[in-house]
Amino acid sequence: MSHKPVAVLVGPPGSGKTTVGAALAERLRIPLRDTDQDVEALTGSTIADLFVERGEDYFRELESEAVRAALDSHGGVLSLGGGAVLRPETRKALGTHYVVWLDVAVPSAVKRLEMNVARPLLLGNVRGRFAELDRARRPLYAEVASIHMDTSELSVEEVVEKLCAQIPSRPKES
């Protein structure tokens, strides 16, 4: 297997990176790697705890290292945290990869996220915080994206179907 991801998923919280990533990897019979999980495994802490105890800058440094390592060694589907694109070095590293920007409209994202307390940047007014993060990150997602897909009104299966039709040099499905 290649040591370059077949697809790198980016997008805001609630866009489906984790769920779509798992379904896409299963469909293509390749491994899924999630850099948020890599950071949690490395530190033994949750992302939320890292934000509270060490701050966002510390987390972003660990995240950047996790992304770099995964881009160099993972040959499956790679899911990045929503803020991974904030670092210029990460955006530069993504330049040679097939990057899928999974997008979601604010109402759909809020519906998906309201019950998730493990997202430290969305505590409080979920709709307002999401809209604020989305405005700041949208140009960065656009900068790195090979394709853009709005998941707001699509099922996981529909997203996976569309991605399978568009991913270049993907493994043959069985």
Give a label for each model feature:
Residues 17:
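Conserved lysine of the Walker
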Residues 20:
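Hydrophobic positions on the alpha1 helix immediately C-terminal to the Walker A/P-loop
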Residues 96-139:
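A glycine- and Lys/Arg-enriched "phosphate-lid" helix/loop adjacent to the NTP-binding pocket
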Residues 12:
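P-loop (Walker A) phosphate-binding loop of NTP-binding proteins
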Residues 9:
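Hydrophobic anchor at the beta1->P-loop junction of P-loop NTPases
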Residues 82-85, 105-107, 154:
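Short glycine-rich anion-binding loops that position phosphate/pyrophosphate groups of nucleotides
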Residues 1-3, 23, 27, 95, ...:
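NTP-dependent small-molecule kinase module
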Residues 34-93, 118, 127, 131:
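ATP-dependent small-molecule kinase phosphotransfer cores
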